[in-house]
């Protein structure tokens, strides 16, 4: 059994999905060393990530970059000599995680305690104490499980889950009744994972027809609001895009009937809250939704059209493998899942 950890860090990209995986890794450390000081380092969007993890009092979120030297000094003060530091795997095949992050992780970790993942960087062999192979046929969460095993830390949590600060005022604010609405989240962080605006509208209309007695609640960011209004035009959907905080969204998801989403952070929040989820993904997002990610019994229906990209992903403004998904079938599944 690994010795108790006094302090540990993980470096992550500043997205909801990546930070959820970082929290899962740290949560397993916390289960084995509850007194440990644990930090998740991001380059930006720390306010959003703190909101995401407001229910985790033991988790420190640190935003560190070259524009925030004070944060770098704070990391040195609080986490120098860490018993374990884990950096993130590369976001795409042939890529590599930030070299500057790797260098700073090396400075913070005790000798023998820096774990990373194989990627395209030629510097890895000089920096890391242990490198974990990344397999494209494995679920994303399996990378973090492999890092825990490499560190000798027992995996206490078989699958990622999420806690939130319960507050039913979100239901009252948006005039919703628990169990009588569906969250519809059709906006990814970039168009390369999303649906064309016309397809968004087709899906909202199909959902409205298939679920006439269920309120549709269209979520998204502030920049998505105008498109959300266009997608829902002529329906009775409630538009909350740009109005709900992450904690409010978690409360709404927890009290919803179902979530319909493209492959983005909100879908993973729903999956980790164990809510019935209908998710549409691209061919390159497959590893995020393999059964090892959330378990064979997770209430998740996955829609994809990988066959369209059989010869390789067709990168377009809006991906062909998303455009080919049958939105009528998605709407039908939202009724029955």
Segment roles from a protein language model:
Residues 1-337:
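Catalytic machinery of carbohydrate-active enzymes
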């Amino acid at each position: 059994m690994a010795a108790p950890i006094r302090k540990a860090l993980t470096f992550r990209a500043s997205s909801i999905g990546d930070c959820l995986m970082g929290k899962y890794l740290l949560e397993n450390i916390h289960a084995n060393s509850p007194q440990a000081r644990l930090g998740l380092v991001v380059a930006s969007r720390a306010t959003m990530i703190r909101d995401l993890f407001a229910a985790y009092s033991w988790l420190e979120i640190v935003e560190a970059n070259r524009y925030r030297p004070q944060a770098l000094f704070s990391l040195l003060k609080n986490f120098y000599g860490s018993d374990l530091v884990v950096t993130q795997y590369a976001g795409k095949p042939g890529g590599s995680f930030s070299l500057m992050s790797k260098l700073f992780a090396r400075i913070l970790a005790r000798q023998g305690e820096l774990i990373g993942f194989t990627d395209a960087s030629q510097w890895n062999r000089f920096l890391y104490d242990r490198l974990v192979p990344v397999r494209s046929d494995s679920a994303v969460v399996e990378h973090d499980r492999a890092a825990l095993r490499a560190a000798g830390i027992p995996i206490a949590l078989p699958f990622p889950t999420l806690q939130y600060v319960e507050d039913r005022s979100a239901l009252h604010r948006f005039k919703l009744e628990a169990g009588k609405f569906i969250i519809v989240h059709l906006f990814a962080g970039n168009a390369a994972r999303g649906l064309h605006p016309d397809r968004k509208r087709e899906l909202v209309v199909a959902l409205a027809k298939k679920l006439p007695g269920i309120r549709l609640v269209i979520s998204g960011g502030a920049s998505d609001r105008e498109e959300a209004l266009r997608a829902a035009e002529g329906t009775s959907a409630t538009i909350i895009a740009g109005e709900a905080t992450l904690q409010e969204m978690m409360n709404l998801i927890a009290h919803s009937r179902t979530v319909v989403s493209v492959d983005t952070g909100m879908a993973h929040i729903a999956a980790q809250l164990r809510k019935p989820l209908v998710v549409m993904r691209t061919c390159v997002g497959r590893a995020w939704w393999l059964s090892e990610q959330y378990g064979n019994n997770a209430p998740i229906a996955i829609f994809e059209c990988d066959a369209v990209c059989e010869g390789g992903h067709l990168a377009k403004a809006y991906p062909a493998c998303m455009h080919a998904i049958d939105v009528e079938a998605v709407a039908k599944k939202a009724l029955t899942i």
